[in-house]
Amino acid sequence: MGIVSPLGLGLEHNWSRLIAGESGIGRIASFDPSDLAAHVAGEVPVGPTEAGCLTLSDWVPVKDQKKMDRFIHLGLVAATEAVEDSGWKPESEEDRCRTGVMIGSGIGGLQTIYDASITVHEGRARRLSPFFIPSALINLVSGHVSIKYGFKGPNHSVVTACATGVHAIGDASRLIMLGDADVMVAGGAEAAVCPLGIAGFCSARALSTAFNDAPEKASRPWDRDRDGFVMGEGAGIVVLEEYEHAKARGARIYGEIVGYGMSGDAYHITAPAEGHEGAYRAMQAAVRSAGIAVSDIGYVNAHGTSTMADDLELQAVERLFGDDAGKLAMSSTKSAIGHLLGAAGAVEAIFSILAIRDNVAPPTLNLDNPSTESAIDRVAHEAQRRRIDVALSNSFGFGGTNASIIVRGV
Amino acid sequence: MSEIADKVKKIVVEHLGVEESKVTPEASFIDDLGADSLDTVELVMAFEEAFSVEIPEDAAEKIATVKDAIDYIEKQKAA
C-alpha cells in the first residue's frame, strides 16, 4: 500500500501522524489564495524524502515531469510505494498479463487544462505542448504505472468524483473475482488545489471559509461550527491480489476486501437525499456482499466532509446499525488531511485496513461540539485503542454516487 | 561552434534530459537521445520559440539529428 497526502509521504509516516492527532491542513502555499474566499487546503509537504516529505525528482525524472499533470506525479509516487511494498515485480509475460491497473481521479489535470487554455486564448495554439492531452487525461495514471512496471493486464480508470477511490478499489477487486486478473494496482490520485479548483468549489459554496486564520481548525466533521470542506491533494494506492496467489508467493497481506456496495441517489447533482438513503443502500449492499452481520463492523471511516451532509450520513449509519450503534466507532480522517476528492476513498480505505491491523480508531479532529448527539462514538480529538476486526469505509460523490467498501484482517 | 549550435545543444539537453556529451552533431533525437515522436514535436516547438523561426511540418519531419536542426535554423536566419 502507498500514500502521499497532506500528512506527508509514505504509509507508516501518514498513519503515525494521523494516530498522533496531527493535521496536514494549512494556508495554501502553492499559489496566493488572497483573491478567493477559501484560503486553506491540505497540500503535500515539500522536502527531503527521509523526513516524510516530497522531493518529486526522487520519484519522477525531471525530463518526464512536464509530460504529466501533478495528479499523475502524486499517483506515481503512491503507486511506486505500493508496488515496492507488495514485492510483486512480475518478470514473465504471463504474470505481467495477469497484472492490471485501475487508478482513478475525480477531476484530472485541472491546472494543465487551465494553462493550456491560456496558451490557446493568447493565440498561441501552435505552441501548445504535444503532451497537453496525455498530461490531463485521468486514465494516464494507470497508463504510466503500467508502462513503468510492465503490467499488461486490464488497464482501466474510474471517474466518479469523490467516490472514485472506493469505486476503483471495489471494481478492481471484482475484476480479480471475475478472473480478469490475479493482481490489480488500484486507487485514486488528485491534485486540484489550484486556483481553478479552489474557485470552482468556492462558487459551489462547498469550501470552508470561516477558518482562514486558523487553518487546522477548518475541517471539523459533525461539529456545529463546520462550514464546508477543506480540499486536500494526494494519492492512495493498494495492490490487490487473489488470495491463493498472494499466499503462494508468501506476500505480506494487510487485509481482505470482503464487501463492496454501490448506489445512486437519483436526487440532486450535489446534495444528498433525505436521510442519505443512497448511502444507506450502498452500505447495506456492501454488508450483503460481505455476508457478515452489521454488528461485526467495529469501525466506520465516514465520508464526513465537514459539510451539512455529515449529519445525513450519521443518520444513515445509525439506521444501518440500529441497536448496535452504541458499540461502533466512526471517525472522519478528513479532519486531518482534508478532502482528497478522487483519492479520498482510496486513502481512507487504507486507513481502515491499518485501523484493523493496529486495533486503533483514528481520531476526528476539531469535533468540539457535535451538532447532533449520537450513540456512535465519533472518536473526537484522540485516537482510540479498541478491537477492530472489520471496518467499513464510505465515499459519496457529486452526481449522487455512493460507494462503501468493507475490509477485514487476515 | 556557432552561437546557434550552442543554443540548439542546450535546448536538446534541457528537453530530453540527456548528458551534454551525447549531443553530438550526428546524434539522432530518436535513435541516440531517447526521444519519442511527441518529444520531437516539442523540441521543434522549442526551436521555433528560441530562434523566432517558423518550422513547417514537412521541414520538421526532416529534422532527425542535431545537425539537421542547426543547419535548418542557420539557413532560416541567413535568409
From Swiss-Prot, chain B:
Keywords: Cytoplasm, Fatty acid biosynthesis, Fatty acid metabolism, Lipid biosynthesis, Lipid metabolism, Phosphopantetheine, Phosphoprotein. The lineage of its organism: Bacteria, Pseudomonadati, Pseudomonadota, Alphaproteobacteria, Acetobacterales. The keyword rRNA-binding does not apply. 4'-phosphopantetheine is transferred from CoA to a specific serine of apo-ACP by AcpS. This modification is essential for activity because fatty acids are bound in thioester linkage to the sulfhydryl of the prosthetic group. Pathway: Lipid metabolism; fatty acid biosynthesis. Belongs to the acyl carrier protein (ACP) family. This is Acyl carrier protein. Carrier of the growing fatty acid chain in fatty acid biosynthesis. GO terms for cellular component: cytosol; membrane. It comes from Gluconacetobacter diazotrophicus (strain ATCC 49037 / DSM 5601 / CCUG 37298 / CIP 103539 / LMG 7603 / PAl5). It comes from the Bacteria. The modification O-(pantetheine 4'-phosphoryl)serine is found at S37. Residues 2-77 form the Carrier domain. GO terms for biological process: lipid A biosynthetic process. The keyword Lipid metabolism applies. It is found in: Cytoplasm. Its main location: cytoplasm. SUPFAM superfamilies: ACP-like. PROSITE patterns: CARRIER, PHOSPHOPANTETHEINE. One of its GO terms (molecular function) is acyl binding.
